[in-house]
Amino acid sequence: MLKIEGLVLASSSKYRLALLEQIGVVPGEVVSPNIDESLLKGELPRRYCMRMARTKADAEAALRSDKFVLGADTVAYCGKRVLSKTESEDCAVRYLEMLSGRRHRVCTSVCLRSPGGIVHERSVVSVVKFKSMSKGEIEYYISSGQWRGKAGGYGIQGFAGALISWIQGSYSSIAGLPLHETYCLLGGYFDLKHIP
């Protein structure tokens, strides 16, 4: 593992930190940015996702101008409809019923801001298809509490992974951090080649 003292992860997601550790990187600091995550009128899902990643990085860079700041955001969406982070059981049930037997997209955007103010951004869009879920499967998933705070009402890392028929794209991106793209962004500034 390479602990990078000059790197701040601007995310409240424990999964993002664990994913970052999978590529051998431990940030010097992990912070939960306090930002407005409201969707703008007419804003498309991918643009919204990138704006959120950039806003997280910008908010923390303003407080830590001498550090590299990595912000990320994940958005699930059907068509142009953003399936926001779920905070209520009713919302999670509605999302899962809507996603049952259907495909939808998941976008994760990453923004790396350097101490000099240089901004690097990447977005990865993947397709996810849920099996046709029974009422019992949805109820079991809801009772697990794994839907809380998750885009689209689910996290692929937990029991929901058993309900997903297939994905097209990046598993790590669906989980919250596209590892290849993040590795490439960080590798532009830090020597990551020695990490096994």
Swiss-Prot record:
Disulfide bonds: none annotated. The active site is at D73 (proton acceptor). It is found in: Cytoplasm. It is an enzyme of class 3 (hydrolase). One of its GO terms (biological process) is nucleotide metabolic process. Pfam families: Maf. It catalyses: a ribonucleoside 5'-triphosphate + H2O = a ribonucleoside 5'-phosphate + diphosphate + H(+); a 2'-deoxyribonucleoside 5'-triphosphate + H2O = a 2'-deoxyribonucleoside 5'-phosphate + diphosphate + H(+). Its cofactor is a divalent metal cation. InterPro entries: ITPase-like_fam (IPR029001), Maf-like (IPR003697). GO terms for molecular function: nucleoside triphosphate diphosphatase activity. Belongs to the Maf family. This is Nucleoside triphosphate pyrophosphatase. It comes from Anaplasma marginale (strain St. Maries).
